[in-house]
């Protein structure tokens, strides 16, 4: 008799994706973050759904509805803080996932990589719109400043901004549409995740050595299901520690004041996971130049497969490239720190230097290091 999981049309898909999937035997814990991202997405959708049951997308009541969730709804406070801090966990996993792809050369699987970039943009858009919903001071001014950047686009900029706002300023129409998009986007992201996995399973997963492992594979279950479960437990432990002990650690105190269009906060800044891009934006004195640099800082990931000049896929045996990779990671930490600082000396010059280094590393230094390593190995 045929096994149901191998014959049933639906079970067959799940079986080929998560149970009998041939997997390289040597993938390390850096490969855990894909499943952790799936778990983060599930947590965000579930908590978000419960929050949406009590939230009202209206400028007069949005702030008080969030307060009502925290004070009056049964366990509303934990749902709200799991959602807010879950976003931080999501981005932490996302950045590590992208970093792992860069380090081990997973960007050579171009379809998977490109869908991943679209996913990154979608998650960033969702998180930005979600930050606007509590309608606190930083929500309002963050929405005003970031959407206003589109006015730098020649000819159509101003019309585009007013079209997004639904008026001549950030108001009720903006909040309503941001809530609608924030609600629908996670489901679009879920569909994109399936496409991401579809392309990944077409080629098979990469591994730390960057070698073909077709001749030596093991089933995904039970080996990697157990391994992913351990990662999930650690992630949930970290999330719950954050939620229960330091729920406001990563938030902005200004967001506990209701939105006031007549009072600008002294330092307008986005959530921590956007600070690196915000620092790059601010490091260029010209508005259009800043917007282009901001977009390029993420879009640059799309041209990395074209800049690949090495004969080895992984960085494991390439010490020069490894050094540059960790300099890039350090540079991103510096940019994140600078993004949260006021625009004054010495932060301006540090931000500009870090931005130049960021683009130089990816566009010039790393491809050059690849060529040097090829030459040293006589390839």
From Swiss-Prot:
Binding positions for a ubiquinone per the UniProt entry: 201
Pfam family membership, one: Cytochrome_B
The protein's role, per its UniProt record: Component of the ubiquinol-cytochrome c reductase complex (complex III or cytochrome b-c1 complex) that is part of the mitochondrial respiratory chain. The b-c1 complex mediates electron transfer from ubiquinol to cytochrome c. Contributes to the generation of a proton gradient across the mitochondrial membrane that is then used for ATP synthesis.
GO function terms (MF aspect): metal ion binding; ubiquinol-cytochrome-c reductase activity
Binding site for heme b b566: 97, 196
UniProt cross-references to CDD domains, sorted A to Z: cytochrome_b_C (cd00290), Cytochrome_b_N (cd00284)
Family: Belongs to the cytochrome b family.
Name of the featured protein: Cytochrome b
Cofactor: heme b
Coiled-coil features, chain-numbered ranges: none
Tagged with keyword Zinc-finger: no
Record note on quaternary structure: The cytochrome bc1 complex contains 11 subunits: 3 respiratory subunits (MT-CYB, CYC1 and UQCRFS1), 2 core proteins (UQCRC1 and UQCRC2) and 6 low-molecular weight proteins (UQCRH/QCR6, UQCRB/QCR7, UQCRQ/QCR8, UQCR10/QCR9, UQCR11/QCR10 and a cleavage product of UQCRFS1). This cytochrome bc1 complex then forms a dimer.
Gene: MT-CYB
Membrane topology (UniProt): Multi-pass membrane protein
